[in-house]
């Protein structure tokens, strides 16, 4: 007899998180079929169109022939580690911009991989400044690559990609962008910005489900990764070559159901009006959220000019009876799931604005939020 408990009863929670996030019924339904990992109907009929569409979304028409997309099993962090471990040669040096948990994670990866690198630690609630980055580049002329998180979901900060990209282009530095929580929800033109590698994940702004991440990169940069990998399964060049030469085939077992869901999510992104339209919806969600939370007495962690439309951190109430776990459970009982804080310097919690979320659903959250504030005398 099995000792695995029965699955909990299905509840249609609204996940107000940075991913995994709430998906549409049609994205989930796309997973209700099985695929053979070596069959042409799957690889050439599903994987290859995904690769082409990712390049189309990432670069303007005049740049698209310069770029290619590589899909890789695992979470987004697996793909970040694949890029760092494959793209930085033994005689090259990486500068990591660290202003949150995900910049710090890249530093941890670099140390584990034995990469020559430097870190610019800006603090969790400070935006990186191009002048400070340039000073670091002047001080360390051995730096060849720069890696930065675009949307640092530790705080919800949108880092200054345009300014940093312009600096890298001017100084001949190869730019690696962790766009995990921004690609698909914020317009980015890799060609215009001169980005070498852009990394994201299926379960973020494209609104798919977890299971793989992807890299969009210059073909020349991918070719230069040959022989550099510090890992077999995370060898970016080998994965790219297999997909290029065998019509979308993955080297190792492909997460077929996740890929089918992602293909449907890409279709739904197009139906919504593309990245610009999705960006407007996310921005409207975030504005509705911040205005409504202010009316309830909650203040955002970041100034408005630094805030992304992806996720927002709010200071926790100073009331002695407030406990995040109790607050969370009261919201969950009403069908809403939020995120705990990740900032070491402030007591806060986070609410995501992405996924199958609209301003109307945010307003429903705000009603639930008012009744979940149990430390206020009239909360029910």
UniProtKB/Swiss-Prot annotation:
Entry annotated with the keyword Ubl conjugation: no
What InterPro entries does the record tag this protein with? Aminotrans_V_dom, NH2EtPonate_pyrv_transaminase, PyrdxlP-dep_Trfase, PyrdxlP-dep_Trfase_major, PyrdxlP-dep_Trfase_small, SP_NH2Trfase/AEP_transaminase
Gene Ontology BP, a term: organic phosphonate catabolic process
Specify the protein name. 2-aminoethylphosphonate--pyruvate transaminase
The record describes its quaternary structure and partners as: Homodimer.
Residues with the modification N6-(pyridoxal phosphate)lysine, per the entry, are 204
Superkingdom field? Bacteria
